Amino acid sequence: MATRIDYYESLEVSRTASQDELKKAFRKQAMRYHPDRNPGDDAAEQKFKEINEAYDVLKDEQKRAAYDRYGHDAFEGGMGGMGGGFGGGFAGAGGLGDIFDQMFGDMMGGRRDGGRRTGADVQVQVEITLMEAFTGVTKDVEVRTRVTCEACHGSGSADPKAGSSTCPTCHGAGKVRAQQGFFLVERPCPTCHGSGRTVANPCKVCHGTGTEAKTETISIDIPAGVEDGTRIRMAGKGEAGGEGVQPGDLYVHISVLSHDIFQRDGANIYCRVPLRMTQAALGTEVEVPVVDGGRSKVRIPAGTQTGETFRLRGKGFSVLRSSARGDMYIQVSVETPSHLTKRQRELLEEFEKEAGDDHAKGSPENSGFFAKVRDFFEGR
């Protein structure tokens, strides 16, 4: 069986693309792969056919709604009731893919909770700063989704009195079954597209689906302590499913931006603090910023080396669903000056002359190094 293309991937657009975005993408791809521009190129010709097929479906709101919910199955005929319209083996069907659709079909609309039909789930990604992740934040996000049709109030019918009737093909189940080899496979009903209802006089706005495409602004409450990659589920905020069908869910994927000063590791925060070599040698007290916006003083003892770390308890990141906080770790980096005044050079030369070989004894790292050198020459 030939691999079926994803219409959105074929046009290189997102699943929430507007009609204008679809049109622009189609024109761009059509110009690129048009046979007149690629004479004798079979691959380009095949691609041109694919993008035309994709745009033909996605430019029609009714076809797009069916495709978003059921994929290519929405346009396959020959699916009658139990056992009807199928050949032997897996011919004319989605094969094992249909079985996996039943298991994992929630993300594209389907059934949950023991058979309850739902609209398609919607996925969005939201970027927040490290500070917003620390305090928590409410974000307003524009979501391209399908909502209950305002014209027919979700009935799908142009005549409110007539309404809809039980689908004669699936008898209201929204799906049909067929025996395929050893498997009993369920697929969306081709007559009602899974709604279980049919409309004699379809609404002119939604064409009988009971839903229409719309861009909505949704407020998302992001709690303090969320980590990069956190997924938040907002029940019932996904796509509407038409008459008698519960809406899907909205899944918000959180992306936490990196920070110029702080690096986060779970509930702990790390901050690199540069010191002059004189500060590290003599000892000092430095003020460092903390993630809640304040400052804390840190005592640096004399003789501090690059890489040494000092901990500030309770000054780290907020913990999700808790009032606790992690710790903050100050990582010291001793910097050597690259530009010296004449006086500074004189002082350092004087220091070096005064220190002499004793310098090695005063530095743990150097003393270890010179001890190893001495042992090497003495044959130890």
UniProtKB/Swiss-Prot annotation:
Cofactor: record remark: Binds 2 Zn(2+) ions per monomer.
Domain of life: Bacteria
Keywords: Chaperone, Cytoplasm, DNA replication, Metal-binding, Repeat, Stress response, Zinc, Zinc-finger
Gene Ontology CC terms, in alphabetical order: cytoplasm
ZnF (CR-type) intervals: 136-215
Positions of CXXCXGXG motif repeats: 149-156, 167-174, 189-196, 203-210
Primary location group: cytoplasm
Amino-acid positions noted as binding Zn(2+) 1 in the UniProt annotation, renumbered to this chain: C149, C152, C203, C206
Domain notes: The J domain is necessary and sufficient to stimulate DnaK ATPase activity. Zinc center 1 plays an important role in the autonomous, DnaK-independent chaperone activity of DnaJ. Zinc center 2 is essential for interaction with DnaK and for DnaJ activity.
Function: Participates actively in the response to hyperosmotic and heat shock by preventing the aggregation of stress-denatured proteins and by disaggregating proteins, also in an autonomous, DnaK-independent fashion. Unfolded proteins bind initially to DnaJ; upon interaction with the DnaJ-bound protein, DnaK hydrolyzes its bound ATP, resulting in the formation of a stable complex. GrpE releases ADP from DnaK; ATP binding to DnaK triggers the release of the substrate protein, thus completing the reaction cycle.
Subunit structure, as described in the record: Homodimer.
Name listed for the protein in its UniProt record: Chaperone protein DnaJ
Organism (species): Gluconobacter oxydans (strain 621H)
Gene name in the database record: dnaJ
